[in-house]
Structures are given as C-alpha cells and as structure tokens.
Amino acid sequence: MKFFALFIYRPVATILLSVAITLCGILGFRMLPVAPLPQVDFPVIMVSASLPGASPETMASSVATPLERSLGRIAGVSEMTSSSSLGSTRIILQFDFDRDINGAARDVQAAINAAQSLLPSGMPSRPTYRKANPSDAPIMILTLTSDTYSQGELYDFASTQLAPTISQIDGVGDVDVGGSSLPAVRVGLNPQALFNQGVSLDDVRTAISNANVRKPQGALEDGTHRWQIQTNDELKTAAEYQPLIIHYNNGGAVRLGDVATVTDSVQDVRNAGMTNAKPAILLMIRKLPEANIIQTVDSIRARLPELQSTIPAAIDLQIAQDRSPTIRASLEEVEQTLIISVALVILVVFLFLRSGRATIIPAVAVPVSLIGTFAAMYLCGFSLNNLSLMALTIATGFVVDDAIVVLENIARHLEAGMKPLQAALQGTREVGFTVLSMSLSLVAVFLPLLLMGGLPGRLLREFAVTLSVAIGISLLVSLTLTPMMCGWMLKASKPREQKRLRGFGRMLVALQQGYGKSLKWVLNHTRLVGVVLLGTIALNIWLYISIPKTFFPEQDTGVLMGGIQADQSISFQAMRGKLQDFMKIIRDDPAVDNVTGFTGGSRVNSGMMFITLKPRGERSETAQQIIDRLRKKLAKEPGANLFLMAVQDIRVGGRQANASYQYTLLSDDLAALREWEPKIRKKLATLPELADVNSDQEDNGAEMNLIYDRDTMARLGIDVQAANSLLNNAFGQRQISTIYQPMNQYKVVMEVDPRYTQDISALEKMFVINNEGKAIPLSYFAKWQPANAPLSVNHQGLSAASTISFNLPTGKSLSDASAAIDRAMTQLGVPSTVRGSFAGTAQVFQETMNSQVILIIAAIATVYIVLGILYESYVHPLTILSTLPSAGVGALLALQLFNAPFSLIALIGIMLLIGIVKKNAIMMVDFALEAQRHGNLTPQEAIFQACLLRFRPIMMTTLAALFGALPLVLSGGDGSELRQPLGITIVGGLVMSQLLTLYTTPVVYLFFDRLRLRFSRKPKQAVTE
C-alpha cells in the first residue's frame, strides 16, 4: 500500500520519473544503429591460393590438403570446406559464434605459415586470407565503364586505386574486383615460326626473363660527388619487347616479333563483366561478419565523390546494386505499423471506457513504456531492425494491458462513488498482484529463448530482451504513473458517453449478459467442455505434425542472385555469349531495374549475375513470382542453366551455391562419391518438392590426356620436366616476367597464340629442343587421347564432398523438401561409404526443428514455475495454462488458412501466445480466489462472479493485443513477409482462445477445486478409521 501511495500522492516526482525514462529512450533511439535483422553472421574467413596452370586434382592434393590439415587444428572451427579448380584453391573456415574474428585471423595466418613448407615451390605468391564470407551477397556493387579506356585499364584503376581505399572503410570485409584482369604484356607464339627458326619455347621464356631485370646497380663516387647507376634493364610495353633478340640462327638475329605477336593486353583474357548491355568492371563489396550493413553502405556512399575524383573523368563510376534502400523501406514499414498499432490500441481503450480523460492515461503510458525501451536496447548493443521493431509493435498490446487492468479497476471504484485518490490507491492495491503476475509470467516465457544457443538463439535473443524490457517498464509505469494520473485526472462519477458511443456501450452490456447466461449453461455441462478441451490438445498435436515448416520466411529484398552453370566442356567465348543471352532475357523483364554479371577465371563454365528489382511500389509481383516467370524463359536457352534465388538477410555457411539450400554428400572413397552423386542428383531432380536442383560436382570436363613414351624420350634426350615445361609455356598463360610500375606490378604472359590452338592439331605443332639441339616434335614421344576430368575438386573437413543445391517451388516448404530427400535417399539404397546431410540454412532448420517442441515445453514449464511461486499452489498454474491449447489451435489453423509455413517467426508468435492468453485466466483466477477468501462464496459462485466482473478488462486486453497485431497481418510493402507470420499466429490464436477460454477456464478451475477437495478428504477418512 505504501509503495503505491508514494507515487499517487507525489505527482511531480512520478511525472519527472516518467519524463526521465522517456528522455533516456529518445537519446537511445537517436544512437541506435539500423539493420535488417539482429547480428547473426557466423565469423567466416576465406583462404585463397593459386598455382597457375595446375589441374583441379593437383590443386586439391598439393595445395588444399596441406592447408586443410594445418587449418583444421584451429580452435573454434565449426566447418571447413574447400574448392579447387584450375590453378586456384579456396578454403572457407566457419567459426563458432563466440569466436573473435580478429583472433581467428591471427590463428589462420599462423596455420598458413606452418603449412608453407609443404606447399609447391612454384606458387607465385603465398596463400592469403580475407575476413569475409564469399557466399554472402554483396552489400553494394560498383561498376566502372568507359568508351575510351580498355577493360584492363579499368580493372587496373579498380584494383589499384578504388579497391584498397574501399577496403579501409569501417565495416568492409572484402572488395572483389571482377570482369577482367590486370594489364599485361601478352606474348602469343607462332609454333611454325619457332620451329623454322629452331627456337624452343623455353628459349623464348628465358630470353624474356633475362631481358627484363630489376636489380640494384650500385653507385660511383669520387672525392666530392656520388653518382647512382641506372640502366635501361627493364622493358615496360609491348613495343619494347617486340624487337628483343631471343636467338641467333645462322648468324642472323631472331627477334621476338618474328616468332610471336606481342600486345598490351591483360593477364587473363578469359574474364568478362557486364552491366546491363555494356562491358564493365565490377567491384563487389562484402561486409565484415560483425559490421552493420547500413552504416557500412553509408560510409561507402560518403566516399564515392572522393573515389570518383581519383580516376579519370572519362571513366563512369556507378552504383549498380545497393542493399540498403529495401532495408530502410522495410524498417519504415515496421515503424508505420508500430504507430498504427499504438493508435488502434488507444482506440480500443476509448471505445470501452468511453471517456476522453480515461483514454489519455494509457495513451501516455504506452509511449513512455515503448520509448523507454530504446535506452535499454542501446545499452545492450542492439539495433533497430525488423525483429526488435516487431517486438515493440507486439508490445503495444502488452504494455496497454497492464494500464487497462489498473485503469479499469480504478474506474469501477469511481463509478461506485469512491473519491479519486482513494479509488486509485484501492484499485491499484487490488490488482497490483494481478499485474505483477501477468508481467512476470509473460517475461518467463522468454527465458528459454535467452538460453537458446546457435543461430536461432542469437536471432531471437534481441526480440525477447526488447519485449521483456518493454513489459518491465510497462509494469513500473502501470503501478506508478497510471494510478497517479487516475487519481488526479478522473472524476468520481460515471463518464458521460457521447451519443455515437452509447450504442457500443449497450452492445457491450448485452454481450456481457449473453456471456453470463451461456456461462451458467456451461458450468452445468462441464464434461462436454472437458471433451472440447481434450480435443483441442489432440488437434494441436495433429496440426503441428502436419503443418508445413521452414526455417525463416522467404524474404523479398528486391535483389536476386543468379548462378550460371554451362556444359563442362564449353569454351570461354561461348560462355561469354551465354552470359549476354541470359542478361538480355532478364533485362527485358518489366520488373527488373538493373543487371550485372561476370564469367571466367578458374571456372570457365560458370558465371554469376546480380539483379536489382524495381521497388515494391513499382511492381505487383513478389521476388519469387518473378523468379517463377523468368525460370520458364531461361529454360529455353540450350547448353547452360541460370539458377535464380532471392537474396536473403540470413545466409548460413560458406559454400557458394546456385540455390538457397544445400544437401552435402561426403565420402572417403572418391570413386564411390563420383558414382553415386549423379544418381542422387537425378533422383532429387524428379521430386516435385524441389526446384533448380544442381550440383558442384563437375567431373566430366573435356581433357586431352597425353601419354609419354619414356623409353623414346630417354633415347631422344628429353626428360619429363622439359616436356611439361613445353605444355605450360604453350597453353598455361604462363607468367614469365614482372613489370614494375609505381602503383602496381604487372606480368608478361606467354602462350601459343590462340589462332593456333583452335583444335587438338595444335599439339602436333609443339616441339622440344633436346640436349643435342634438335627440334623433336611432341608427337614423336607422346600420344594423346580425349578423356574426362574434373573441373573442380571439393572437400569438407578432409573428406571428398559434393553439394547438391536446390530451391523450393512455390507452395512447397523446407520440411516438405527435407522429408522428400530423406525418402529418396532411403529408396536409392545409398551405401554407407557415402554419407548425406543437410548443410547451411537447411542444416540449421533441421537443428531448429529438433528443438522447437522442447523450447515450447520449456516455456510452458517456466511459466508454470513462476505462477506456482506467485500463487503458492501446484493447481492454479494448471488452471491458467489450460488456456494454451485453444490458442495453439487458432494459431496453426490461421497459418494453414493463409498458406504460411510454420517458421521461426511463427514460433515467436506461439511463444507470445503462451504469455498473452494466460492473462485472461490470471484475471479470472485472481478475482475468484479473492471472492472465495473474503466473500464467503462457493467456488462456482466465485468463478462465475469473477468471469462477469473481469469480462470487460478481458475483452479490452484481448482486443488491444489483437488490434496491436492486426497491422502486422494487413501490412504490405517491403519486409511484410517477415511481419505477416507473426501477426497471423497471434491474431489466430487470440480469436480462438477468446472464444474458448472464457468457458474452459472456469470449468478447469472447478475441476481442480473438486479434485483438491477429494484428495483433502482421504487423509481425514483414514484417521477416523
């Protein structure tokens, strides 16, 4: 009593306390960062190594394996995958959530150093690492185009000037430059001219290497001066290499230009990038795992004018893709939803109380509670994101509940003629314990979420804490500010109703009277109600088992990614044509705003595309509908497939895949893996639950297998080293010398001119100079035949791995796909040597599925414990929790009605319902117990009276919660696919529970009371006997 009086009789102190809470919240709001979701990125580090010309199998065995053995010893590595392709190896290390990325990077560098002695000596550079996940979609893509500068020059500007500057911006983890390669002097050899002059490819390589040398020359001194010696020992351009003498034939000089075409070109001509229909260089910017995407993008945008000034005016620097606009739009939608929810909740209060003065009180309490929460969010290191703002939206219904319960009880005493301050004190004292019970039991629901580990726990923690803090502040406000305002603002008389509201009042009275009559009948037919309650429990189980499930709702971020997978033997020229064809099909779609793409590098038969859709207001279809439409058009392109997927804010795993979900096959027997992977992939491709089924196993690339006749080689004076060097010189784009410039270093690249390598007859033109100086054709000591070879070799851990990726067709859920894959694996009879498991997001979904039921049970158990402690009873908490089955049925039915799968967001809704619907039972039980203790009423009379007295606040709190969630259901625009499942779950659960619990709770209360009496009599009878 004294606690409540302290605030009621000291209005200035109470007001200032509330003002202080509000001001702290405003300051916190201004300093909170903005993000699409809570920080849930796994720490990921990518290690890259190169050995130009090496086959994928050579890269896997000689580069990937030694590095994997060393990297695998690092503490905290949760997953290690690698992919080796032509001349390149990439290892992805995913660490535990709690692993510091900087500490992990130091360990990675130490592991690379430890493995250095085991790596091939011919590697042009040491392995490097980056603190970024290559499978993440870029947060921003910049493009460089020009009508006057070549692609190589544009690439040079991008990699030498722009990329290093952008990499230094806070939050940037990696800047990947694509679309071409660095400038280089390319030497295209003419095999016939070399043969005619008696010059070997090694002669040319040695001559060029010796002619371009950068060594110190020293200095000259006399008594008074010092001269630095400088020579023309370096060759910089193709024109300077052209007259280089590489050999003498019969006394005549053979110059490089006589046997080769020398051009200023690029290091790797098998690279191409485009934006819309124009050649372009792409800068794909990815953030650090712990970085805030909005802050990082804003920082990059702020530096763009400076970046533009560092490159020539003839180069056009543009933003081709930016993830931030849709994130900002989504958050604006949530903020609007929050404002609408607050307005609707206050409208509900006004309709029930029919008093402007009384409505002002919750209209003040709600904003104070919500705004004050921002301060706690800032102190906890949270952000303004979709989940935290949804928590505040849902909190509007919760925080007003406390104020409603206090306000309604005080108003009841005022209408009975009590003085305002006395009514405030008495009314608050009566319901103080009720409000405390409702708030503590609601917070208790979220305790299991706070203890939940892994990605789901990290994702839901911010939601749970935000909502719990809002409820805590609401509890304080409802017991301090609300009774004070009631005592000083409300009058000791019945409120004057506006004429237009009298009808609503009469309707509410009629509704209450009808409820009283129906309740009397129900209390006389308790068995029927008991059967209904048991039926709802059974229906819950059946609905949960049968409802489609997924991990997270499919988002429409306005950005699509596309992976191109072509025939494994396709040439680069043909692949570039495929890229152009696919980009034209997509660019012509009316919903597409911008398209960028690239192909080439170590995997010629693959490419990537990044598609920006028009804003949601300018298109009628969702991203998935657009993908479905484009899929039909893209299927007509022969020889290649383009797999599209909508970019999501949550991406798990480091595998770069052409679809959203992955299923990984592992084996220690590579032959078994290569045998079974095609069978499994073909089987999965026939399943209607899966779409865009593809695999990263590519072991049918065209290969020319050369077989040396070692006896003949020995007789002719040729060793294998010389023969292999010939092939590398001719076909490996071999980097034979370095050109040093002030800003960068460039290469001299040698190969047989592409004009002479159009078919396998090019091998017949190759020759080796033996130890006697004779030119020996390759065909004299080698035979060749076409064969198949892998384009890439993949590992997970230290096992061979193949990853099958898939998307979900419209109307199918991840649970449908998972079950279908499990059935298919069983039907195929896959041997034990080949192990299959879900990876990435699909793996997290499997883990979450296993813990969902446990989480719900833990929440119910926690609420039971808290209620048991508060009521000092084993029975009353069961009465209160009997409201849950009807809410569960309503939520699951609503999800099925709206064709929404059960996701992590829907799970949040179920958890919230556990806290919401029990409030009605708490109000009933509290007043029934009070009536039994002090009113000398029978249990049936007490619960009947409690139901009637609490009918108005029950309707108010339920409708407040319902109208608080309704804008989530009706919201459209950006991010609505995240909000709607939460709103659907809550609204469906509230409607069903409101219809049933007004009757089931009194019946359960009487059942347990009779059960208690029956057990309390038995000991007495035993003593009498």
Curated annotation (Swiss-Prot):
Any keyword tRNA-binding? no
**InterPro entries named in the record:** AcrB_DN_DC_subdom (IPR027463), Acrflvin-R (IPR001036), Multidrug-R_MdtC (IPR023931)
- What terms describe the molecular function in GO for this protein? xenobiotic transmembrane transporter activity
Q: Which keywords are on file for this protein?
A: Cell inner membrane, Cell membrane, Membrane, Transmembrane, Transmembrane helix, Transport
User: What subcellular compartments does it reside in?
Assistant: Cell inner membrane
Q: Which SUPFAM superfamilies match?
A: Multidrug efflux transporter AcrB pore domain, PN1, PN2, PC1 and PC2 subdomains (SSF82693), Multidrug efflux transporter AcrB TolC docking domain, DN and DC subdomains (SSF82714), Multidrug efflux transporter AcrB transmembrane domain (SSF82866)
| Superkingdom of this protein's organism | Bacteria
UniProt function note: The MdtABC tripartite complex confers resistance against novobiocin and deoxycholate.
Entry's family note? Belongs to the resistance-nodulation-cell division (RND) (TC 2.A.6) family. MdtC subfamily.
- Which protein, by its recorded name, is this? Multidrug resistance protein MdtC
- Origin organism is Escherichia coli (strain UTI89 / UPEC)
Q: What is the lineage of its organism?
A: Bacteria, Pseudomonadati, Pseudomonadota, Gammaproteobacteria, Enterobacterales
